[in-house]
Amino acid sequence: MITMSHQLEKLGYRKYECRSCGNTFWSMKERATCGDAPCDEYGFIGNPATDRSYDLYEIQDKFMEFFAERGHEPIRRYPVLAKRWRDDVFLVGASIYNFQPWVTSGLVKPPANPLVVAQPSIRLNDVDNVGRTGRHLTCFTMGGHHAFNSEDNTVYWEEETIKYCHDFLTHIGIDPSEITFIESWWQGGGNEGPCYEVCVRGVELATLVFIQYRTLPDGGREEIPLKIVDTGYGLERFAWISQGTPTAYDACLGPVIEKLVELTGVKIDEEILAENAQVAGMMDIETYADLRELRKRVADKLGISVEELERAAAPMESVYAIADHTRCLAFMLADGVIPSNVKEGYLARLIIRRTLRLMKDLGMKESLKDIMNIQVEFLEGHYPEIRSHHEHILNIIDLEEHRYARTVKRGRRIVEKTIKYLKRDGKAEMPLEILIKLYDSHGIPPETIGEIAEESGFQVKIPDNFYTLVAERNETETEMPEEDVHLDYPATELLFYDEPDDLEFQAEVIGIHENGLILDRTLFYPEGGGQPSDTGYITAEGCRLRIKHAEKIGAVVVHRTDDEICIEPGTTIRGFIDSDRRLQLTRNHTATHLIVSAARKVLGDHIWQAGAQKGVKSSRLDLSHYRRITLEELQEIERLANEYVMMNVPLKVRWMDRDLAERKYGFILYQGGVVPGSRIRVVEIPGVDVQACAGTHVHRTGDIGLIRINRTERIQDGVERIEFSAGSAAIEIMQKTGDILRESSDIFKVTPSQLPGTCERFFTEWKALRNEVSRLKEKVASLKILEMKDRAERINDLTVIIDTVDADMDEMKNMALELSATVDAVVLANPEGKIVGAASEDAVKAGLRINEVISQAAAVLGGGGGGRPHLAQGAGPATDKVDEALEEARAALSTVRN
């Protein structure tokens, strides 16, 4: 722990030890406890701690202005979708996430130094507590002032940080004698360091972290070159203590809550709310047992039963949770999260479906789209980016609401089947793992599962922290660690960046690795970024090697060959690139950028590249999107991409410092994925697209030639795949399509323009003929049935029909079922070795099992059969033994007594 007592002492604070929790803390006045709950009760409810009341946005402005006046550059908030610039977490959980890992590792300069930001942040690790405790939120605004100190540039450290905090709190009218600084340790997002938790009247308002370490995978830590001031001021809590309302929701979401109360008719009991918040503040609410204990304590204080408390509090808690959740969704969806069954999309869908369930509990008739509209209208005055995505947000919510309704309807059958299996295994209660799996895999809410289970007398216990458990399983990316292969050779000089048109080069062999050559320089593009490697050949001293693949291991390019290597290290070689392949891959790569840009224009700026694979003949591009792309949209994307080609825009390709590139272009740079390094290669198509990209590209968009979109498919929930071709491959596809059109026209002896109408007419006529054939078959079958009825025979006490018919399996089943209404048993076979049996209800009650009869008969055909006692079928390859099979059936029936 670094020592930070000097500044605190100068400000008049003294060190104490909390008699309740044992933590070390600092205070201006002598006190026994540290000032944080549960050691101290909330002392601000009904008794505001500041000199005036602030709403959330007033305190946010006050915070930003305070630090701007003290030399901090205000920066715009980052998207809550952290995957825009990092690949280890899905959502922003604190303002420091904005600068991890690139700035905090020292690789990249910060956007300003020092800086201040009001960052919307999302944490779902307490989602079940939202609405219940008065203080828990899924989405909150973290005010952060940050300073990044290096060896040659010390901005400020602990003394200034502590004074800034003290001054800001007193600036808004908080009595300094009520402020405590608790010594602690912080860890998050891959970094850690000592910290102070700053509390007033029982609530933690800010955390002052002094980041000095990187957290290692094994739990250890190592020092980092930067020393970072990372502060987090909970701005919702500042608004809360300034207003003294019963809950933080009332202080920050008042207009939305008022509208929800009006719509639901829920009665707000401020006595219960205040008492609940007071008691919750004294508890660490982590588990189901904690929540039960909270309710018991509140009920005891109010002199009512737990059941009475739950009846009174549950509707209010639902209103608060809906207000919080819709705010969280507004930021998620505006910033590009697409609800799905995976990754950040799963978390968005979890919040959507939990909100829908809460609305159902309240008996709300309004749609979630209606409620989201209320929330968006409230937020858009403060966040222009939410205003610009208003329609997009509502479209997604509307679609998700309909999907949820279908899921619940479909879920009944799945739940009933699961309960049946559990009962068969002797279980009387659904295990938690299965409850979570039904939600995780099928989207069935636990409350719905409980309702269905209750109907069949099966027990389901839903933990109060169910959604928290589910969220925790899905909050971070889980990837298999890659094997770290290191080659002890100098970095390969990559010639294709400076000389993109060259196809021949000279280099020296500096090593051999497995079946590959390592050169000091190369024109071979190694596979990466979804672009396959170049191929070609290498020659030296009469030796010629075909290069099938080039790959980059670290900074070293290995040129793979299937030939026996006949070149020694130290040899000078000549390399030759397959020109047609390079040209097609280059065209397809630039075409990918154009299609992404066109898709964003047509579908919306939520579109984000989820993957890509370039090819010679065709390429594919995966895009995040909440619904299927329509034919009209696809045609417009194709038209726009080709318009970019015809504009013949010259590309600008250059290396830039990462921080400068991000400042100029934003995170749109990382459409193709997050790239490492302090310097990145920026490929800009002015007025069209810009991306950080290491692939090969044409000089001008006109060099691509034709772009042809071939097809689309939904490869997973929330991801659309576009398959396309460019250049000569696109022309080839067009010509093949034209050939198919001409051949089809020739078959019908019409012109291509007449083909759709002709096909429609032929299809209509074919359907009519099919219906006529079906009608005639039914008539023939009826005649055949009459004929067979006349040939019914008696076997012991049974009336049976055994015959061969020229009909398929379905037709034989229909015949057998119809005949079994007039006789005891029917066995029919066709010349293809198919056999069917049916038995009347009376015959089955008397003991006839037609499935056993058919099984014996099918065995004669060399096959097998089965079914139910009243209807069965079978088949076998021995078509010459159909008559024998029927005789076997006759023999089997002769053993049955009616």
From Swiss-Prot:
Subcellular localization: Cytoplasm
Enzyme Commission code: 6.1.1.7
Enzyme class, UniProt record, top EC level: ligase
Cofactor: Zn(2+)
Alphabetical list of InterPro entries matching this protein: aa-tRNA-synth_II/BPL/LPL (IPR045864), Ala-tRNA-lgiase_IIc (IPR002318), Ala-tRNA-ligase_IIc_anticod-bd (IPR018162), Ala-tRNA-synth_IIc_core (IPR018165), Ala-tRNA-synth_IIc_N (IPR018164), Ala-tRNA_lgiase_arc (IPR022429), Ala-tRNA_ligase (IPR050058), DHHA1_dom (IPR003156)
Keyword Signal in record: no
Record comment regarding domains: Consists of three domains; the N-terminal catalytic domain, the editing domain and the C-terminal C-Ala domain. The editing domain removes incorrectly charged amino acids, while the C-Ala domain, along with tRNA(Ala), serves as a bridge to cooperatively bring together the editing and aminoacylation centers thus stimulating deacylation of misacylated tRNAs.
Biological function: Catalyzes the attachment of alanine to tRNA(Ala) in a two-step reaction: alanine is first activated by ATP to form Ala-AMP and then transferred to the acceptor end of tRNA(Ala). Also edits incorrectly charged Ser-tRNA(Ala) and Gly-tRNA(Ala) via its editing domain.
Protein name as catalogued: Alanine--tRNA ligase
Species name: Methanothermobacter thermautotrophicus (strain ATCC 29096 / DSM 1053 / JCM 10044 / NBRC 100330 / Delta H)
